[in-house]
């Protein structure tokens, strides 16, 4: 029996006991009518799918994002490690574990990234766009430094939203220079900074700071609408010309590209088109990186829901 072994180091045949984060949990029933828990456990090194057969206990979806203590055996299912849980319980105040082992954090210097974001905002030449960005960064900067960018899709670790935003700003800055005849750099950088910033109000966070669910506002409105409304409000307060306010709102409302991907409207100017593509590039590359981290070199990953395919981790 091995204790508190990191998920990245697990291999078929390992018998383990320790503390992990219950990333997802769903009560299910087999074809024979027997109950079981379908779950995923995580630590700072990765995620492993897990099953607890013949389980009809209290642990379920409401416990996602919390720390759980388990005992189990690692096997292999369709070429991917899977954990069969033999014993489990939620951790409580009497338990002793190292949180730094469990909570995944963005693999960047967050302070350095935040300072770079601030410098990008200061470089926005249009004073109206710059002032809106400065105000929203003042309101939400602390949250931006820490919250994930998503529950599970991409950048779902502490500091993930900052990493995603910083990556996108760097890309937007480069592309605004490449396409300087076509693109308004100030509008593109402002839209890039603000496109996901209302996820601060959209998400419910666990005590560990990970996304567990959506707030009522997040569920009913979503971060696109929340962000556009906030931009409109600040724009009025600051006396921004209406045409500029509408363009900046459009950037936020259209950045998912197409209605089937959650866009309120489709991109209808060069800057909004570019923003939706930059967002897609960065989120897609993070999905690939996370899959490669969990997939041995020379093999294919498990099917990835977000992109509906497996990827090959080449040497």
Language-model features and meaning:
Residues 20, 65, 168, 279:
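Divalent metal-coordination and catalytic microenvironments
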Residues 25-35, 46-100:
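OB-fold single-stranded nucleic acid-binding module
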Residues 276, 293-294, 298-315:
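N-terminal intrinsically disordered, cationic/polar leader segments
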Residues 95-218, 258:
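Acidic/His-rich, divalent-metal-binding segments that scaffold phosphate/diphosphate chemistry
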Residues 38-43, 205:
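Short, acidic/hydrophobic/Gly-rich beta-strand patch recurrent on exposed beta strands
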